[in-house]
A protein has these predicted regions:
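Short, well-structured N-terminal submotif of metal-dependent ribonuclease cores
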Residues: 1-67, 170-177
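Conserved glycosyltransferase catalytic-site signature
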Residues: 9, 81, 111-115, 133
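Residues that scaffold the ATP/ADP-binding catalytic core of kinase and kinase-like folds
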Residues: 14-15, 47, 86-90, 139
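Acidic catalytic patch
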Residues: 70-107
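Acidic, PIN/NYN-like endoribonuclease modules and their adjacent C-terminal/linker elements
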Residues: 118, 122-177
Length: 177
């Protein structure tokens, strides 16, 4: 598989586990171009900070792992003006409201980063590698994403086909609610 992917937090954080899933490890080791959006960095840092309140030893281990990830040279995708504008359109869509705000009684409050990650995918025209398909499939129904790949299953759930097979065509995106 010679692809470029935007990593979702769940895929990156799988590598921090003591016994990561072998299928995810194989994906991370064989895909030559993996990109980390700043939204993922925020979620990882949020998780480490939350863990530090209850398990400082684990937080130190995760912090060391995070520093290793940062030194590994993964390209970091910053929130550019284009990403921010797309993110704003997605965040304003009432169909995606629960991804941005979440439910008051949810076990894990939402932080809106799946919508932010989708904005990166749309702006950069790159597929997302995720195991969190439900949220991204909802976004895809509203705003077709360039692709959703689940490395745990080694399966595409959404994949845009080229308009003309064998010919690269730059896609232009028009976002309207």
């Amino acid at each position: 598989m010679l692809e470029t992917f935007i990593l979702d937090t769940c895929v990156l954080s799988e590598a921090s586990r003591r016994r990561p899933n072998p299928a995810v490890v194989q994906f991370l080791e064989t895909v030559p171009d993996l990109r980390l959006p700043t939204a993922v960095l925020m979620e990882v840092q949020l998780g480490i900070t939350q863990v530090s309140a209850t398990d400082p030893v684990r937080a130190v281990r995760l912090g060391n792992w995070y520093q290793w990830v940062m030194s590994a040279g993964f390209p970091i995708l910053d929130t550019t003006r284009e990403v921010a504008e797309i993110w704003g359109v997605l965040a304003a869509d009432p169909r995606l409201r629960n991804l941005v705000v979440g439910h008051a009684h949810a076990k894990r409050p939402r932080n809106g980063q799946d919508v932010h990650i989708a904005a990166f995918a749309l702006a950069h025209r790159l597929p997302i590698a995720t195991m969190n398909l439900r949220d991204f499939e909802l976004i895809d129904r509203c705003y077709p994403l360039p692709g959703l790949y689940n490395p745990l299953e080694a399966r595409w759930h959404v994949r845009m086909e080229p308009l003309f097979p064998g010919v690269e065509v730059e896609r232009k995106w028009v976002l309207t609610p």
